[in-house]
Amino acid sequence: MSAESWLSGRYELQNLIGRGGMADVWKARDHRLGRDVAVKKLRTDLASDDTFQARFQREAQSAARLNHPNIAAVYDTGETKDPATGLPVPFIVMELIDGHTLRDVLRDGRKILPRRALEFTQGVLDALSYSHACLLYTSDA
């Protein structure tokens, strides 16, 4: 494995599992604890922008305060150097949730029964309500 596929000498990036406007998400192996994790890494083209660096850091801190069964847990954060530019690139290590997204299910044309749709919706609403209450509480403290 190349040095670029390792973060902090601990996390081995395996495959890209998602892309967003600000970051890429990788399936990785935590060799210290012997478990698979998700690593969200700020896109290298945004790493030189202090605003994006700060936003990414705030996201990590906010997410780390949350402890809910419907929200991926944050395990660690860190920084790696972009080999091309030498710039620091932050990353967040999170719980890996295996499975399919709702988008995948719908794209495959599978039907979701109303009861199952209600379960999905209730899970999302529970997580949103919890995170909203936690973030309001911590910003008032």
Residue ranges of each PLM-predicted region?
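Conserved N-lobe loop of protein kinases adjacent to the ATP-binding glycine-rich P-loop
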Residues: 29-36
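Protein kinase catalytic-loop region centered on the HRD/HxD motif
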Residues: 124-136
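Conserved small/polar residues in nucleotide/adenosyl-binding loops
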Residues: 137-141
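Protein kinase glycine-rich loop
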Residues: 13-20, 25
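Conserved short submotifs of the Hanks-type protein kinase catalytic core
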Residues: 85-101, 105
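Activation segment signature within eukaryotic-like protein kinase domains
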Residues: 120-121
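Activation-segment/catalytic-loop signature of the eukaryotic protein kinase fold
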Residues: 77
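AlphaC helix of the eukaryotic protein kinase fold
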Residues: 43-65
